Amino acid sequence: NGSDHRFRFLRRPLVEYSPVTEKHLTDGMTVRELCSAAITMSDNTAANLLLTTIGGPKELTAFLHNMGDHVTRLDRWEPELNEAIPNDERDTTMPAAMATTLRKLLTGELLTLASRQQLIDWMEADKVAGPLLRSALPAGWFIADKSGAGERGSRGIIAALGPDGKPSRIVVIYTTGSQATMDERNRQIAEIGASLIKHW
């Protein structure tokens, strides 16, 4: 099983913010463990190692194109991909494109049922997105999400949520070009989320 293959990365330099992989320099991690670290903890080294397994950023972009997303592109690795330089098309997407892609991944036939459920489980277990949409979620609502942050005030989240315990609604929010602090950006996204939920 490829997901149980163990990667040893003692000689591979860790990149900034790698809270899980930095603890496994001697014993390594499986692909499954790297996926969990990248999604639930936003571990940057885990993301880079996973990119390596599929052939790098260009292969991820090709995969997205093959599933119909001709907008989203990944050109670089962590942490350089977070630069968010104005008018730079590298490492970018658009909310509508990402919403469609997320819906296909979570509810379409692109992945097997088991893989879809595993992805949802990892996103549901997200440990670093608490101050964002989760803080505005009504009691009993389901949420599976993945947040991100970058330079120049960039902050974002993609989420599947719903009142029925299922990922029935897709939300994608991106902000950039802001002087706001991280806490302020988190509150802004939470407020946008609260407004969306109020109108559903």
Model-derived regions, located:
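Active-site-proximal beta-strand/loop segments in catalytic clefts of secreted hydrolases
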Residues: L10-R12, I39-S42, T53-I54, R76-P79, ...
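Terminal peptide-recognition signature
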Residues: A38, L64, V171
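Extracytoplasmic
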Residues: G2-D4, L64-D69, D88, T93, ...
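Short, well-structured active-site flanking segments
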Residues: N1-P13, P57, T61, T112-S115
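Soluble periplasmic/extracytoplasmic beta-strand elements of cell-envelope proteins
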Residues: R6-R8, L49, I170-V172
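Structured C-terminal helix/loop/strand segments within mature extracytoplasmic catalytic/sensor domains
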Residues: E22, T53, T100-P131, A136-F142, ...
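Conserved catalytic neighborhood of penicillin-recognizing serine enzymes
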Residues: L14-L49, P57
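Mid-domain, small-residue-enriched loop/turn segments at the edges of structured enzyme/sensor domains
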Residues: T30, N48-T107
